[in-house]
């Protein structure tokens, strides 16, 4: 049986991420959202902390840019239908995008679900989606990688 905190976590994922991402063609699988574009894919991963427990859940948002040609060079086998964030060419956390240290969202018995849902939706709309918009083609990815290496 799930604890109140686990139920809150499920609600926060369902109401915080899905309503914003589904209309933008993101598909959900487990704690991952993936959107495939013509040349690249965008991934949002919800990573639970291994230090939490059933009554205190901590998680953060990881972001990835998946590029099929890069994946083919470094992996064998069929291209994944739902790639995961660790195999992405470019990987970031919400911390990187917000310019903060180690941000983990926390859920416990006293968490205000609606407040946390609002914060997550703002982070998606203000930081994650603009980041994805900057990296929606192979050309833009190559320019970003070149810029980061300088």
Place the predicted regions along the sequence by residue.
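Intrinsically disordered, low-complexity regulatory regions enriched in serine/threonine/proline
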Residues: 1-9, 28, 35-150
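Amphipathic alpha-helical segments
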Residues: 7-28
